[in-house]
Amino acid sequence: MKLHLRWQILLAVLGLLLALSILSFQGHTAVLSFSADLCTTRVPAEGGVFTEGVVGAPQYLNPLLSDANPVGRELVSLLFDGLTQVGADGRIQPALAESWTVSEDGRTLQFTLREDAVWHDGEPVTAADALFTYGLMQQEDFPGSPALKVLWQSVSIKAMDDRTVEFVLAEPYAPFLEATTRGLLPEHILADVTAAELLTHPFNQSPVGTGPWQVAADQNWTETGSLRLTPNLLVWREGTAIPTIEFRFYPDEASLITALKNGDITAVSHITPAMLPDAAAQPDIRLFTAAAPRYTELLFNLTEDSIVSTLEVRQALAYALDRQALVDTLLAGQGIVFEGPYLPSSWAYNPAQLTAYQTDPVTATARLDAAGWTLSEGQTVRQNGETPLHIRLLTLDSEPYLSLAQAIQEQWTAVNVSTTISATTNLRESLASGQFDVALFDIAPTADPDLYDFWSQEALVRGQNYAQWNNRRASESLESARQLWSEAERRPYYDTFLRLFDSSLPALTLYQHTNTYALSQNVNAADIGYLYSPRDRYASFANWFLLYRDVPISCPATPAS
């Protein structure tokens, strides 16, 4: 009898341990079901395919060639790592490099690679990979962005040893650090490839990188219209319940949202304002929204012959706008109103230096009157002498820009300002022509707060200072800031720049974009947080699961009443 009792105790203990192990499987919270004395718990099971839909398709899965293709850029960011990466706070953080140093003269940087950095095929990442990658961009026939070639041709690169890379700059240039976020290419695979051969190389369709995802073998995504990725188990060391992510490429938003509604896909990475009502109406879809590193602005033409060359007119146009109404009515609330040329996530953002342009038609009217633009009896448009206050508003010939331009036109009409909308398919060319008073477009700022190429005096001739803002002190502040490496030393220069920017108002920020991610309820244990980069939405992917099994266990004892 005693022996029999001992076996009963042992079996009970083993049963309890089994139950506890099931309950704690991969850190998931178990779901208990009760039936008499028998309970079941739902635990993750490995398997299934996570399908994500996107509009468009990549052309090259290559970090040196993907800049012009939004889908390609996102996929490349999942497959490749740079020496560094941009953190959620906009600051540069280690990636393949574990650390770096800057010389006292600010011209020499040395990066030390991580000892455990390896390619998807298991080969170690070495300084030779860095030299090869940056060397391709230095070649005259490099087929990627011309700006990359210009930058890297001015840099001397040397491998100090297998794990140390040295860069020597022509002069101190703090924004250079962000250039090291670009993904590296494997020298051991591409050593004999020249820059001219990059565009047609098979590597672009089936690359080997270092990122958290790798391209699955035996597929032709250019023909099938979908790309399968598998987890890089050197990153996901504990494994993942979902073994495959499949990106499906759709020609337009209509076909993408239809696929989501029909259950053909389990996620959509970018729900636009136009897609939001349909997505929100699906009971089995969850929506996650976060701020995105992009904003929309109004750029003023400050040349003498522009009708907005007077500060009071620009301020009046700003006060006449209800930016929150634009976001709420045209973007379904998918925007965040803020001030200035820096995103709130940037360390250079300082709202204390900026005027908050709250909607104020009375102030707008007073500023216009003070500038000489008055409204005569019986007239609907203000005039200064015989000249009517007529704004030429330039924007892209697509949505949501056309609808935004029309709404802005209506709001300015309320203070008796006439507006003509000019739509273009080539914004850069139209801006360079100067044939506009105000331009409406998007800005995707770099993580580094350097705005020299947009607002300096040099950018009037060899940059993108399309507003023609010619301010010597602002230009000097930007130039000084980019030559310093310490954030503490740079900050006062950016504060000065912001004060000058605010006092001149060469541009008015309308809103920061948001990124809305749609996810099926069939994806369990998914927790989506910050969405600064494409990787962010998969931060907790190790916990996600599509399949599960119900396992019977003994019910927990019920306390006596």
PLM-predicted stretches and their roles:
Residues 201, 232-278, 409, 416-420:
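Ligand-site clamp/hinge motif
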Residues 51, 126-133, 162-168, 212, ...:
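Alpha-helical secondary-structure segments
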Residues 54-76, 96-97, 123, 146, ...:
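A structural "hinge/loop" feature
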Residues 21, 25, 112, 147-193:
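Surface-exposed binding/hinge segments that line
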Residues 98-143, 160, 166, 259, ...:
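Aromatic- and charge-enriched surface segment that lines or borders ligand/interaction sites
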